[in-house]
């Protein structure tokens, strides 16, 4: 839920991708299961507080609605004025009450059990507001928001570098075909074929390289200033493939199988207010896909020798066949998806879990 909300907020949406890659990297590193999902308890507290805020706001919303209705029925009447004043006072008290409840622990009883004397003493105390400030900065520090945004942006930038040239070649071949003479169609076909082969090559490596980038970043020394942490180094992915070719192919096929159905949700644009609902589905599908890649890398880290070469060839052929189907859908996406040719650049499999990147 939190990842879906983050995915709809510009810039913060990179944190949703960063979190998924961070979890995938922890799986690859071999951490315990409960340590592979940082911030779960914090997210639970945030959800509980949000739900409690919604429930406690309902009575005030009802009074505000009565005040608005009264103003429509009897403009400038004493009853309407009284209701408006009451609604504003209660709204202000509600804000203070919510701040106090969260500072007191954010439990259900803090929101629902009135303690007016303690409440008044708290909000009139200077120490209370200093404690609120400390808790706020501690909360932001626990979120590690900047780290996740930076990780998600670096992974997205690496994906765009890999996808830019293949996508451009494919778009040139498709876009210029109706305007080119028949004797020149062969050149465009070769250009499109080259783009498809380069796209296949990129998709073969990208899922692994994004997770290995997050893994290398998590274990790198603070003095390490590398910006993309090897996401452009295909030898890293090739090394993983040589050790666990069957697992590599299965993981990549599952990754693409989870990403492919989501393209049907990108056929027609919907109001941006409803993007949150689609983002839930994108997170539910792509999060397990990232974790599968982490599991595959974890297996490769436990291997010291390369697999038998016939297994590597069998796994490679199966993987390329699956990627070929995916690339075929990308070709169709140029004509069927809302974003048209831009969908070749903005592939949700490697970017934040957002249904539409072009408004």
Question: Which functions belong to the PLM regions below?
Answer:
Residues 1-267, 275-359:
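Helix-coil boundary and N-terminal low-complexity module in membrane systems
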């Amino acid at each position: 839920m939190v990842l879906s909300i983050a995915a709809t907020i510009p810039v913060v949406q990179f944190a949703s991708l960063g979190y998924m890659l961070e979890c995938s990297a922890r799986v690859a590193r071999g951490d315990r299961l409960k340590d592979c999902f940082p911030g779960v308890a914090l997210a639970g507290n945030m959800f509980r507080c949000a739900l409690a805020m919604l429930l406690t706001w309902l009575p005030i919303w009802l009074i505000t609605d009565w005040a608005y209705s009264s103003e429509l029925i009897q403009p400038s009447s004493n009853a309407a004025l009284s209701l408006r004043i009451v609604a504003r006072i209660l709204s202000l008290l509600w804000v203070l009450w919510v701040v106090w409840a969260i500072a007191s622990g954010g439990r259900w009883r803090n929101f629902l059990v009135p303690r007016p004397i303690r409440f008044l003493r708290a909000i009139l105390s200077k120490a209370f507001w200093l404690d609120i400030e400390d808790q706020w900065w501690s909360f932001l520090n626990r979120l590690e928001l900047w780290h996740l945004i930076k990780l998600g942006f670096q992974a997205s930038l690496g994906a765009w570098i890999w996808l830019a040239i293949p996508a451009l070649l494919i778009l040139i071949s498709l876009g210029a075909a109706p305007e080119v003479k028949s004797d020149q169609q062969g050149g465009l076909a070769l250009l499109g074929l080259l783009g498809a082969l380069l796209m296949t090559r990129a998709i073969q490596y990208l899922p692994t390289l994004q997770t290995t980038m997050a893994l290398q970043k998590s274990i790198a020394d603070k003095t390490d200033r590398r910006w993309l942490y090897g996401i452009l180094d295909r030898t890293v992915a090739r090394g993983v493939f040589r050790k666990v070719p069957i697992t590599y192919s299965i993981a990549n096929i599952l990754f693409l199988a989870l990403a492919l159905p989501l393209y049907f949700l990108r056929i027609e644009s919907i109001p941006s207010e409803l993007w949150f609902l689609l983002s839930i589905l994108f997170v539910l599908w792509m999060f397990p896909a990232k974790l599968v890649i982490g599991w595959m890398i974890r297996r490769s880290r436990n291997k010291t020798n390369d697999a038998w070469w016939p297994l590597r060839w069998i796994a490679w052929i199966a993987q390329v066949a699956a990627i070929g189907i995916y690339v075929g859908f990308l070709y169709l996406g140029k004509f069927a998806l809302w974003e048209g040719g831009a969908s070749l650049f903005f592939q949700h499999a490697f970017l934040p879990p957002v249904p539409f990147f072009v408004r």
